[in-house]
Amino acid sequence: MHRNQAGPVICSLLSLLAFAVAAAAEPAGSPARLAGPRNAEADAATYDRCLKLAKQNPGAAQSLAQTWHERGGAHPADHCAAVALFGLKRYKEAATRLEALAQAMTTAPAGLRADVFDQAGQAWLLAGDPVRAYAAAGQALGLQPNDPELLLDRAEAAAAVGYYDKAVADLDHVLKTDPKRTEALIYRASANRALDRLDAALADVEKALSQAPNSVPGLLERGNIRRLNGDLSGARADWERIGQLAPGTQADMAAKANIERLDLKARPPPASTSRGQ
């Protein structure tokens, strides 16, 4: 179950409107307020430029964010600095900064703070700390209860920790609102497979693939379930299909590794030889 990859997730961040709200929310004693009236349009342009730079040259974006922070950029500058750290694959530092930022934004709208906690959770996952990721996702949901995107992210963190029942519970909530959500069906299938609930897992993934027949995650998951059910030819067919749809991807590499394991098990043992015969 892998919802978020290291690339674009955290860089599709806050809108400029959210930036304006966060900047306006600075307390009276903050550097932004002490620096005197700010040009909101100029700050919005700096924020936009900083986020774009974080995708292209995160080191330069980090320098820009630091300079901007020293000049009173406050929360938006801190946010861009965290994005730059993410781009540099310094995920633990990015997660720490995002978490601190979300906690500091006490006067910002709940939805904005929830987004930043959620981004911290994504960074914690990539830092290899799913327990912190799960906690951050929980803080996000405390601010924005029942948000389906936040529930999906917490379900991923729960599965990474091994809390498969909790992952299923979050995904149940998502699917009550949107029973046809393919992504959630596949994630729930994965969690149920881990719980050895293979009938439920297969039902979910079959429904997902009936809606999206070329879903690579769905095919990978159904192959896993079919293998556990003893349907080795069906598993092979699903994994080979991934090679046609998404050659060279991580999913394709995982599928090829699964096929190799099938082939190894299918090979007869080498004939034994006895000396002197």
Where are these regions (language model features)?
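Residue-level recognition of tetratricopeptide repeat
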Residues: 50-51, 83, 122, 156, ...
